[in-house]
Design a protein with these regions (language model features):
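Hydrophobic positions on the alpha1 helix immediately C-terminal to the Walker A/P-loop
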Residues: 3-4, 8, 31
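Cytosolic-facing regulatory segments adjacent to core modules
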Residues: 11-98, 112, 219-222
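Short, ordered loop/turn segments at secondary-structure junctions
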Residues: 24, 53, 106-107, 148-149, ...
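C-terminal regions of RecA-like/P-loop NTPase motor modules
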Residues: 41, 46, 56, 82-99, ...
Length: 248
């Protein structure tokens, strides 16, 4: 989910939008490494992590860093941030003209301490979800709030996630205008995706499970974990030829 969100941040930044990323899970340096790989043409994430880069990869990293430095993407990597802190940070950036999009990674890591006692976890998550919604309305910006799923989807044959899998609170579904569930069949050892029959290698899906003002459905994307890249999905020519023969 982090890789997908970071690609959204890059796309918005390239389009000239001011992006604020609140990362409660990863330090800013680690996000920077992922962005370098995403921005470069073919920079191996493993090579970057180990520091063992070829001459070509070094040049790619330098050029990617130069390009990234020009993008209006800002990071707050406070690991103990509450929704109130995130709101204050977003308000400050908005006052400077630096916040057209807010990304929060992720909901369950937010500091949910409150003066209200005897609240259960579901109530805490519901309050945090509601505050994220209020931030979006107050600042009049889209807020992308990442969230963990529970393990129920792993009990299904195809492991496909559903709205009911949103972890710890049904309020998330109620508050959100759009709910996008990420799904990669290959992670579960599946060789193809059930509905499309596409081969699972390199395949990712955005399942639009809720869209308040539009249609729901599935969107396919290509994923290369070695290069930390997300883009258009294209089945191999071999698969297309084989599938065409089987359809005859």
């Amino acid at each position: 989910k982090t890789a997908f969100a970071l690609h959204l941040a890059l796309a918005a930044g390239r389009a000239g939008k001011q992006v604020l990323v609140n990362s409660l899970e990863m330090q800013g340096e680690r996000l920077g490494d992922r962005w370098l790989c995403a921005q470069a043409a073919s920079l191996d994430a493993g090579h970057l992590k180990s520091g063992q880069l070829s001459a070509d990869e070094q040049q790619q990293a330098l050029e990617a860093a130069r390009q990234l430095s020009c993008l209006p993407v800002y990071v707050d990597d406070n690991p103990k941030a509450s929704m109130d802190h995130i709101r204050s940070s977003a308000l400050l950036q908005k006052s400077k003209g630096h916040c057209d999009l807010l990304i929060i990674d992720y909901l369950q890591l937010c500091d949910m301490k409150s003066e209200q006692k005897n609240r259960n976890r579901e109530q805490e998550v519901a309050e945090a979800s509601r505050k994220a919604k209020l931030i979006a309305k107050e600042l009049d910006i889209p807020v992308i709030l990442l969230c963990q799923l529970n393990r129920e989807c792993e009990m299904r044959a195809d492991k496909r996630p559903a709205l009911s899998d949103l972890r710890e609170s049904g309020a998330i579904e109620q508050d959100a205008d759009v709910v996008m569930l990420l799904y990669r069949p290959a992670l579960y050892g599946l060789t193809s995706e059930r509905k499309s029959k596409f081969p699972s290698e390199g395949l990712g899906m955005v399942i639009l499970a809720k869209h308040r003002n539009g249609e729901t459905g599935d969107v396919y994307f290509g994923h290369n974990p070695t290069l930390t890249k997300i883009g258009e999905y294209e089945p191999t020519l071999e698969w297309m030829a084989r599938n065409a023969r089987s359809s005859c």
